[in-house]
Amino acid sequence: MRKTASRVSVYPYDLANGRLSPMVPAGICVAGRWRVAQFYVDSGAFYTLMHATHAVDCGLDFKKGRKSYAQVGDGSLIPVFLHRLPMQIGGKRFEATVGFSEKLGIRFNLLGRQDVFQHFKICFHERRKVVTFQTVECC
């Protein structure tokens, strides 16, 4: 079996709603257009979620995605429309399930576990205020 070297990307925490938080830049290809967006790394979130305006800005009819519901912090459910999209974090490119919602009530995107965390060993270092993504062989 051939092994490939893993890559490590280190991201300093950035502000999210006035607090230093584990934020990472990720490339996402929406309707054939690559853009970079900031994501809050949320190990408690199943799906990666973005506000619907990101899809609309790229010309994607997000409501053509598979409709599902995501539970948010106050316990309520919001509708999300799921799409399989190319993403890139550091040098690792992969396909991920991304949900778009008009009801996402936070000002930042969420990077969830589904289709994302399997590609990385992710370490939160609270004292240093950094999050590291180390690529791993998967699937």
Language-model region placement:
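Pepsin/retropepsin-fold aspartyl endopeptidases
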Residues: 1-139
